[in-house]
Amino acid sequence: MSILSENNPTPTSITDPNKSSHLHNPELNSGTRVASGPGPGPEAESTPLAPPTEVMNTTSANTSSLSLGSPMHEKIKQFDQDEVDTGETNDRTIESGSGDIDDSQQSHNNNNNNNNNNNESNPESSEGDDEKTQGMPPRMPGTFNVKGLHQGDDSDNEKQYTELTKSINKRTSKDSYSPGTLESPGTLNALETNNVSPAVIEEEQHTSSLEDLSLSLQHQNENARLSAPRSAPPQVPTSKTSSFHDMSSVISSSTSVHKIPSNPTSTRGSHLSSYKSTLDPGKPAQAAAPPPPEIDIDNLLTKSELDSETDTLSSATNSPNLLRNDTLQGIPTRDDENIDDSPRQLSQNTSATSRNTSGTSTSTVVKNSRSGTSKSTSTSTAHNQTAAITPIIPSHNKFHQQVINTNATNSLSSLEPLGVGINSNSSPKSGKKRKSGSKVRGVFSSMFGKNKSTSSSSSSNSGSNSHSQEVNIKISTPFNAKHLAHVGIDDNGSYTGLPIEWERLLSASGITKKEQQQHPQAVMDIVAFYQDTSENPDDAAFKKFHFDNNKSSSSGWSNENTPPATPGGSNSGSGSGGGGAPSSPHRTPPSSIIEKNNVEQKVITPSQSMPTKTESKQSENQHPHEDNATQYTPRTPTSHVQEGQFIPSRPAPKPPSTPLSSMSVSHKTPSSQSLPRSDSQSDIRSSTPKSHQDVSPSKIKIRSISSKSLKSMRSRKSGDKFTHIAPAPPPPSLPSIPKSKSHSASLSSQLRPATNGSTTAPIPASAAFGGENNALPKQRINEFKAHRAPPPPPSAPPAPPVPPAPPANLLSEQTSEIPQQRTAPSQALADVTAPTNIYEIQQTKYQEAQQKLREKKARELEEIQRLREKNERQNRQQETGQNNADTASGGSNIAPPVPVPNKKPPSGSGGGRDAKQAALIAQKKREEKKRKNLQIIAKLKTICNPGDPNELYVDLVKIGQGASGGVFLAHDVRDKSNIVAIKQMNLEQQPKKELIINEILVMKGSSHPNIVNFIDSYLLKGDLWVIMEYMEGGSLTDIVTHSVMTEGQIGVVCRETLKGLKFLHSKGVIHRDIKSDNILLNMDGNIKITDFGFCAQINEINSKRITMVGTPYWMAPEIVSRKEYGPKVDVWSLGIMIIEMLEGEPPYLNETPLRALYLIATNGTPKLKDPESLSYDIRKFLAWCLQVDFNKRADADELLHDNFITECDDVSSLSPLVKIARLKKMSESD
């Protein structure tokens, strides 16, 4: 008779007739209870086993002459059944036998549950049986002694049956089994169904009850061999259906368990020829370790998804789970051992075991001494592959360690997802298998540790995923970063790293060094604030970016600080190339500073207004050494700003520079000149661009230079490679082209490089200045290819923005004219230092050619602009393609661009990438701005009246002029007596169109007696007409400057203003620009607030604002300090306006705006010139308005109840002042 185990589908032979006879005892029936352990424990002996009664019926299908059928026949029959049940499973199982992955995947889930169940057994009760079983004789596979089949009959007493049961348990416990053959989930469920440790399985009238019973017995015996017997309370037999499902799940659930046939002739055994079984974990010989801290198994099992299959089956049979009792608490655990995916023999390598300590948690386990582990290592051996040979009994502490390991694994895997199973370093194999396990461990870690889907257990998944996240996380490089310099303060209170433009600003604004040291943080805040408000913050950031790149020499904008090498000559080139704020938007694909420079030469981009277009051309072209110092010395955008007037509002003076320093750089090869730090930063800073002027085109052309190329170029400053690079005269700037064209031109130049990929400067242009050396460009191209950095070619950038290289005819003409310029670096130096006659001739011819070229390109630029306007809403790629096509078609009649620019930018230069990224961001911002403008115009069309205001309002009389339009008076056609004020604005010239929409919307929704009434708005031919109520009395500024106001009159103005502010604040609107200019009066003295362009909307989400707007002298400290602010900023401005009415001007009006901001931020509440002459009420009111801490500052409603307001005069008291102001104003105008 064969006993089929779920872990070993091959029948196991029984040689002892005494031990096999009880299987055929007809008394064995559904009530059979199997001894719980391999040895006869005291409790096992006292437990009677009811003999089965229908054994013969279950084997009636057997045709063997034996009473219970032939063992071989049973084996064949069982194999056939297994083939159906475990068809695909066997393949995976066989793979796992050789250390494959399946073992670590599916069996991990099943075996964790089984291990917990196995560990519940009492290790002490198995010691005695271990002694008995060690001397069992060996048996041969497939042999049977059939005499035992006839010794017992149906009337055998129960004692004999019990002895047979125990002997069969002992015998089967010695059978070899594959690693990881702990109970499968199916067997565990069967055991849980009966709620006993040894699992009583009852079969009632089932056709295959004997086979199922044999299968169950084998599993129980194997389980008992690993776990000590435990007293089991009597069990209520389960129903036939549940028992059948439990038993049938034994085979179906064993998907990844190792299976070793006991019959070597079996066909399945051939598949397992490569498998090496592990040792039978013996019985524990040492005393049990102290129990670990209590573990709430229920919580662990609830959290873990590993028990999903077991729990489902267990819940179906309404049986309690054995894992949920407290028996596991008495089993010692080790925190440095665990089961690797599927249960295997304990690792024999102590060091490998200890390595796993870091991968497991010690929170729920108790550490044991390692003496037992090291002891067992020396005595453990491996089983033979066949089960026929009796295995050598391993040392006793081996089993103890395995129990510990199993328990630790179950606890840890469910408690902390540290990847115990998958990433385990401890492979419980013995002998040589341990070595292969270490290899497989790495495979598991690499294959499953990073893949969530491959692991079947959630705990191991989470552990491996946490590990993989750490490994796989890739932090991208920063983008959109604008912080390029850090300004610090040393111990002496002086600034470190302060940008030069900031130093100039501070010195020009009258902020002394002492004041800077007293309030260093305030100075930095107000300077940053001033820059943000006086210029485009994005442009300022890009300027710093540009400057910083020069400083580090890592960026492609190498020539930003070099004298404007732009052919347009003049500092504008340097400004444009060098990072003037406005130029940044035009530096799109940094890939072509060259083309960009061509564009900039021809077109002065709005941001790059050339310093003095004519002066700069000649001063830099003819006498480069005179003005270059200023450009080069600062090395910061400030210098460019100053000279190029990029930021006209900035009063900073030019920094002094040493023109002779340029001579030091002049002898350098163009490459070194183009590099910001070619030899030393000091040289470049101090050097005037005289040499740069000569080589200016080459400098500007340089895109980005890698560190390698920098070194190589430095080492070969005087090498022959650069002998022919002669200084090219910068082309004159082109004032004739309007700004709008310059923008499109720069875009076209940028777009072209994108397609051409011309990152290395267009070398062919160099031929323009070296007639005899037309082949030189190729030579230099090859040379620079090796360095992967673009050479600084002296190509003529003045050409139109579209073609990177000047026309061929121009090149040949220039070549013939100035061949000697490229002879050698020494010659280049001589040309720079020698009289300017040759240089002037070159410049003249160059300018003439450039002028012709510009005239031809003017029409093309206009066409490009129109095309760009049509394609504004398309994505950047489409727009680029369109512009490139237009550019190519436009430039084809002149000269095709040289193919050299098609080189890709050097990937090795990090600075080039940064520069390219900055240029792309700039281009993107421009596109976004255009889209935003279109959206604003579309919004205005929906807000404004589509009619023609000229049909409704006549007799327009201009009474004022603003930055973006004029103010007119007109009569309403519908009521001639009604005079209205019309604010006419050119949207193209309006810097912040969104403010207009804001103003219209606020005025439309703000109908209040103290707010100027909004009548209507019109959008006519690009001009916005805003029709408002006309306040003929003028502004409060006229009264303040032409008369002296009493406290009562001041109180009236404050009261009416506070009423309007209270209304605005109640609607969530902050005016942010309260001052006398925005308080209008009529002839009767009525007061109304106007100019809502800067007003801000406050909502629940954004209860405070941090933008910086308004007029500096009236600004609250929290705005100047760039802190969050709320409606109380209008109260501060009202307090400043009171001082204005008292003293005729706001505080610090005579100071520069920057110093005024500094004083506001540092002085706090401004001091009155003559406070003694004022009453207590006005001083108290004023102090309440001018609290530096806005939390202590009053709001509009509180101020309206102040005595100063309640006791003020009537509005009619202002009428005389209005009339006086009008008379004085009229007399002044006459």
UniProtKB/Swiss-Prot annotation:
Enzyme Commission code(s) on record: 2.7.11.1
Keyword flag Transferase: yes
InterPro entries membership: CRIB_dom, CRIB_dom_sf, Kinase-like_dom_sf, PAK3-like, PAK_BD, Prot_kinase_dom, Protein_kinase_ATP_BS, Ser/Thr_kinase_AS
Keywords associated with the record: ATP-binding, Cytoplasm, Kinase, Nucleotide-binding, Nucleus, Serine/threonine-protein kinase, Transferase
BP GO terms, sorted: filamentous growth
Residues at the active site: 1073 (proton acceptor)
Biased segments, Polar residues type: 1-20, 175-197, 207-224, 237-246, 262-277, 311-330, 550-561, 604-613, 629-642, 750-761, 811-826, 877-892
CRIB domain segment(s): 475-488
GO cellular component entries: cytoplasm; nucleus
Reaction(s) catalysed (UniProt annotation): L-seryl-[protein] + ATP = O-phospho-L-seryl-[protein] + ADP + H(+); L-threonyl-[protein] + ATP = O-phospho-L-threonyl-[protein] + ADP + H(+)
CDD domains in the record: CRIB_PAK_like, STKc_PAK, UDM1_RNF168_RNF169-like
Pfam family, one: PBD
Class in the EC hierarchy, top level: transferase
Sequence ranges of Pro residues compositional bias: 789-807
Bias kind Gly residues: ranges: 570-581
Span list, region Disordered: 1-384, 413-470, 545-831, 867-919
Task performed by this protein: MAP4K component of the MAPK pathway required for the mating pheromone response, and the regulation of cell polarity and cell cycle. Phosphorylates histone H2B to form H2BS10ph. Required for hyphal formation and virulence.
Protein name, UniProt field: Serine/threonine-protein kinase CST20
